[in-house]
Amino acid sequence: MSPRSDSGRSAGVARAAACAPWVRTRLRTAPAAACALGLLVLVTAFLAAAFPRAVDTYESKGLRHDLVVEDPRRSVLELTAPPPALGVEAARAAAVRETALGAVHRKVLAGLPEPVRADAFQSSYGIRTTEPIAAGEKWLPRPYGLDPKLTYATPSALPAHATLRDGAWPTVHGEVTTTATKVEAAVTEETAKALGLKVGSTIAVPTRGEEPLTVRITGIVAPKLPGAAYWSFERLLRTPALVPTSSKGPPLYYWIAALLLPPDAAPALLSTTGAPEPYWRIAPDASRLTALEVDRLRSRVASLESGPELLKLRALAGPAATLTTDLDVVLTRYDALRSAISPVVTVAAVGIGAVAAVVLLMTGGLFAARRHSELALLRSRGGSLRGIGGRLLAETAVTAVPAAALGLLLAVAAVGPARLWPAVVGATAVAVLVCVALPLGTTLLHRRPRLHGARDDMMTARPSRRRTVAELTVLVLAVGAVAALRRRGTAAGGGTDFLVSAAPVLVGLIAALVLARLYPLPLRLASRTVARLRGAIGFLALARAGRASVSGAPALLALLVALTTAAFGGSVLAGVADARDDAAVRATGADARISGEGDAMPMPDRLVRDVRKAGGVRDVAPVQIEYGVPLPSDDPGVEDAKGTTLVGVDPGTYAKLARATGIGSFPADRLKAGGAAPRKGTLPSKDRVLPVLASPAVAERLGERPRDIRSQAGDFKVRVVGTVTRTPAVDTAGFLIVDAASLTHRQTTTLLVTGASLDAKALRGAAHRAGSTFAVQLRAEERAAFVDTPMQSGAEGIYAAAIAAGAGYALLAVLLSLLQTAPERTALLARLRTMGLTLRQGRRLLGLEAMPQALLAAVGGLLVGWSTIVLLAPGVDLVQLALSSGPGSDALDTAPLRADPWSLALPALGVVALAATVAAVQAWWAGRRGSITELRAGDTR
C-alpha cells in the first residue's frame, strides 16, 4: 500500500470524526444530565397535562353526583296534558290506555334534544287523579274524625319496580271503559299498614254516573328502589301522609294515600271526580353528562319548558301539554358551586405553574453554567450564534419532546376521561418552554466576549433601568391584583380572572425582588460583626455568601413563590376543616346534645344522672330553652311579635362550656343575681332584677334600664349586663341568657355534654329510657356528615397536590442553586485543605455559606406567605368549598381564609434543612476525593 493511499484514508477518517453527529455525541458524553432533564420535563408535563383533565373530571363527576342525589321531585321532567275532551267515549278510553300513552312515551324519549337524556327504566307514564277523593268506608282510620282521601294512578311497569308481598298483581278483566264499575288495585306495604288495607278490601269511588267505581285491593307490594325516581317523584305512591287541614284554628289531620291500578284500567278514572290527567315522567340520565354540557343542558331544558322543544312535545302529547321541572334550579346551584371553587383552584394552578417555569429556567441556567467554557471555545473558533443555538435546540428537543409526550400519555392514563386538547396544550407548553428557553438563554450569554473571571455577584450588582422599570411594572400588577381580589373576591363575573388568580404569585415575585435588593445589607452588617471575632471560618463563609452569583435570584424567586403557594394551599385546606368544625359545633353546641322535639320537652332528673354516668362524659350543662319570648316595646301595649329565645343556664357549667367551644365566652359571675333565688314554684319579687347576657340586637332593643319579660318560665325584670354574638345552646340571632336558678318555673329541656370519646350507645340508651321523644346529636357525627362531593374532593385533592408539588419544586430549586456553584466550592475546599483546613471546618464553611440565602428564603417565604394570606383573606370565601353538603350547609354565612401555622413553618424549615444537608454531603464528598484534579494549573475557578 502506497503512502499516498494511507494519507488519503487518514484524511477520510479525520473528516468522518469531525462530522460525528452532535446530538449523539452530547448524549453519550453526558447521559446523566440528559436523563435528569428528561425526568424533570416528564414530571412537569405530567402535572401540566393532568391539571385540566382533573378539573374536567371532578366537575363532571360533581354534576352527575348532584343529579343522582337530588330529590327526584326537582330533577325529573314531568309532561302533563288535560284529559281527552268530551266526545265519543270509546275514543276517550282509547286515548288513555297503555298502548296510546306508551307510544307517546317512547316518542317523547326518542325526541329529547341533546344533552337531555332519559333514564328509560326509571321513567314512567300513566294517568292519575290530581284531586284526592274522600273515602267514606267506616273501617278506615280517622285520627281526627276526618275521612281519609285517596288518589288513584296507573303507573307503567309496576311489576318491574316492585315485589309482590301478598295477593296478586292487579289486572283488567276484559276491556275497561269509562263506565266500568269494578277495577283492581295494589297498595304498598306502608299504605296498607297505615290505612288498615288488606287483600280483598274494597273502596267505593264516587263517579259522575249513577254507580260508584269499586276498587278491590288484590296485592300488597314493596318498592324495589324506594329512593329512585319511579317511586320518589310522587312519594304518595309508596308512603301515605297525615295532612293538616287549611282552615283557621288548631290544625286537624287526615290520611292521604294512593292506590295503584293496572295501566289498562285508566279509562275507569275518567268518570271519577278526581280530575284525572295523563302524565309522562322523564327521569334524567346523568351517566354521560359532562360539565361542558351544562349550558346546553340548561338551554334545552328552558326550551322544553317554554320554547321550540315544547311545541314538538305538544305535537305528540296534545296542544295543551305542559312540561314542568326544577332541573334548571339544580343546574344553577351546581354552577354557583363551580364558580366559587374554580377561581380558588386556579390560584393553586397559577402558583405551581410559575414555580415550575422558574425551576425549568434554573435548570437551563445550570446547564449553561456547566457548558460555558465549551460554548465559549466554539464561539471563539468561529461558531455562529444561530449554529450553536440550533445544535442546542436539537440536543434539548431529543430529550424534552419524548419526555413531554410520555408525561402526556401518563396523564391521560392516570386521570379519568376528559377533554384531550387542554392536556395536549399543557404538555406542549412545557416542551416548548424547555426547547426554546434553554438554548436561547444559553446562546445569549455568548453574544459578545466577556472578561474571564469578572465578578457577577449580588453584592456588587447594580440594577439597570430596564430592571427597575420591570420591577415597577410587576409591582403595579401585584397591587392591582390584590386590590381586585380584596374588592370583588375570586369570582370575576362568572369566570376566572387570571390576574386575580395570580395575586399570590405576584406578591411572591415582588417579595423576591425586594429581598434581592436588600440581600447585601444584612450580609454587610454580619460581616462587620464576624470580622471582630476569632477564627476565619465565619468571615470566609459570609464573604463567600456575598460573592454569590446573581444567578441565585431565580432560586430565591422559585422558593418564595413555592412557599407562598404551599402556605396558601395549606391555609385553604385548614380553612375548610375549620369551617366544618365550626358548623358542627353550631349544630350541637357541645360534643353531644340531648333534647326533645323543639327543645321544649322537660327532662326527668334521672336522665341527667344517667348522662353524667355515661362513659367519656366530662361535664354536663343543663339548659332551659324557650323560643318566642316576646320583648317589651316602648309603645304601651305593643310587644314584639317575633320574640326572642330565652336560655336559662347554670352560670358555672355554661361559662365553662362557652370557653371550651370558643362560642360566646363570658365570666360566670356576670349572671349572678343579688339576693336569694326564689323557691321553685313561687313568684319572684317584683323588685327583683335579673342580670342577663343578650345578643347585640336584643341588647339594643332592651336598652340599659330594667325591662319586664313575660315567659312560661316566669315573669321578671331583666337588665342587660353584657352582649355575646353567639351562644352554644341556640344558633339564633336573638337570645337572652339568664341564670336558671332565678326562674320561677325551672325545668331542663336540653343537655349539652362535653367529653372525649363519648359512649354514644350509652347516651342514646339513657335518652331512650327517659322517653322516645329525646334524641342525641353527636358533634363527631355532625362533622362526619360533611361528606365531600366529587367537586369538593377534587378541588381539595388539587390543593393537596399543589402543596406537594410546590414543596418538591422548592427543594429542587435549592438543589439546583447549590449544584450550580458546587464545582467552585469543591475547588475552594481543595485549596483550603492545602492550607490546613480540616474536614470539620470544611463542613462548617459550606454550611455557613449556604445559610444566608436559605435563611433569607425561609424567613422571607414565611413572612410573605403570612402577609399574602392576610392581604387576600377578605376576597377568599371558602364556604362553598367547605359546606356545600351536609346538614348544616347553611350554618355559616362565610368561611374566611386563615393562616395555617404548619403550612407556613414546615416548608420553610424544609428549605433550611435541605440546604444544610446538601452542604454537609458536599463537604463529605469533597473530603473523600483527592485535591489533584482541583489544583490544575491555569484553572480559573
Predicted regions, residues:
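Membrane transport/envelope proteins' first extracytoplasmic loop
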Residues: 1-354, 490-501, 514, 584-592, ...
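Actinobacteria-biased recognition of intrinsically disordered, low-complexity terminal regions
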Residues: 1-25, 318, 614, 635-636, ...
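Alpha-helical transmembrane segments, especially those used as permease/efflux helices
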Residues: 4-9, 32-36, 44-50, 267-272, ...
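Interfacial "coupling" helices/loops that link adjacent transmembrane helices in transporter permeases
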Residues: 30, 358-397, 813-854
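Short beta-strand boundary microenvironments
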Residues: 133-195, 609, 618-619, 623-705
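A short glycine-centered flexible hinge/capping loop motif at secondary-structure junctions
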Residues: 381-383, 403, 407, 836-837, ...
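Short helix-loop junctions at transmembrane helix boundaries
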Residues: 396, 405-426, 488-499, 862-910, ...
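Juxtamembrane segments of multi-pass membrane proteins
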Residues: 488-680
